[in-house]
Amino acid sequence: MAKFQGYLELDRFWKHDFLYPLIFREYIYAFAHDRGLNKSSLLENVGYDNKSSLLIVKRLITRMYQQNHLILVAHDSNQNNVFWSNKNLYSQLISEGFAVIVEIPFSIRLVSSLKGTEIVKYSNLRSIHSIFPFLEDKFPYLNSVSDVLIPYPIHLEILVQILRYWVKDASSLHLLRLFLHDYYNWNSLIISNKSISIFFKSNSRFFLFLYNSHVCEYESILLFIRNQSCHLRLTSSGSFFERIYFYEKIKHPIEEVFSNDFPAIPLFFQDPFMHYVRYQGKSILVSKDTPLLMNKWKYYLVHLWQCHFYVWSEPGRIHINQLSKHSLFFLGYLSSMRLNLSVVRSQMLENSFLMDNAMKKIDTLVPISPLIGSLAKMKFCNALGHPISKSTWADSSDLDIIDRFVRIWRNLFHYYSGSSKKKSLYRIKYILRVSCVKTLARKHKSTVRAFLKRLGSELLEEFFMEEEEVLSFIFPRTYYTLRRLYRGRIWYLDIFCINDFVNHE
């Protein structure tokens, strides 16, 4: 209960725009620690060594405000090296604490069972598999698709400027700006791509919030103009919490803000059949109109990024293709449009005739080559797809080794349940099964043939059981119906993030 009361106190601070005092609360870092242990975030925990105390945080903030980098260079370098050697720990402390503070309003719905607490329930966190039924319904009636890769901000100051629309606590913004600039001064005087990648990797949860704020601001403007042009509510699917902020902005008079920047919507942007779908940093624009209109949207997006967000983007980053001639790689699936040809016989009185009927249907295929590349990168096979033993797992128990391989296979099969051709997954199943046997044989210092001869080839059969067989045990009377469903596409709506082996980008 004390932990829940801490969450409620955070929520009260957020409502009154007082974020800066929360940075000096020690339980903030306890929350970050607990969340890292529970792995409630989509990202892996970067490590926590119980060194985050309130005293360290206060000393860090005080030194950030007082230090002069030009003077530090001239003073004793040995004393400064002690401080610089712990820069990763200090930056992680501040970033984790700040990430907890700004994410609490989104996690507060988890404690809605508390009495006397009025908490808004958000329903925007949808499964990413809900995107594909949308594509199945809309794609047959659309012509052009634009593959958009959202660019990253070239400077973190842009992200701080965007946060000013949400966070009105000037002290928090000042501390955030000082922290970001101070981190770069630790690396070098010139901001390089390497230092940015190091910062993003060591502070992934904190960067996720900053990047989502950038995407939210970009989508707010884009969707506002799109809705102004067609006066229809846009169907957009995603799994991250920045969409909540967008719908919160709708409740406020954002028209007054955007109308000043965009006083008139050009006529050539009026497209009632424009659809926008995004996951992480990749999005697609699909339209029924000609490629000319898509090109106008393309150059509009480039100017929006360059002029409003000061982000350099080339038109070549946005690709426009015809759905009938192009395969779209999105969320690990290779989607394409194909025609189902059928012949219908019609008879009227004494006359009969045949009619050719062509229906568009979307195909969702499994990209086997990128999957094998991911397995090779994780040392389950070589570059040609030949299974090898997982040497790093040879020290585990037999059941643990089998459980790890089975979990990977079932997660992949579960994720690609919407594929129209599941037989292509049998090669992935073969690689994982043989790699599992080779790992067990390596552990027992035996050959694969001798190991299988001693224990039997049926050792792994029950562990790699097909979902079709599992469903037949649960529903034996409807086995043939389930078999037809198995051969078709099944979109499981409990998938909220892309599989690690599927994310090849």
Curated annotation (Swiss-Prot):
Gene Ontology terms: cellular component: chloroplast
Single GO BP term: tRNA processing
Keyword match Zinc: no
Cellular compartments annotated: Plastid, Chloroplast
Record Pfam families: Intron_maturas2 (PF01348), MatK_N (PF01824)
GO molecular function: RNA binding
Main location: plastid
Keywords for the protein's UniProt record, in alphabetical order: Chloroplast, mRNA processing, Plastid, RNA-binding, tRNA processing
Cross-referenced HAMAP family: MatK
Chain's role: Usually encoded in the trnK tRNA gene intron. Probably assists in splicing its own and other chloroplast group II introns.
Family: Belongs to the intron maturase 2 family. MatK subfamily.
The protein's name: Maturase K
Organism: Ulmus parvifolia
Origin organism lineage: Eukaryota, Viridiplantae, Streptophyta, Embryophyta, Tracheophyta
Gene name of the encoded protein: matK
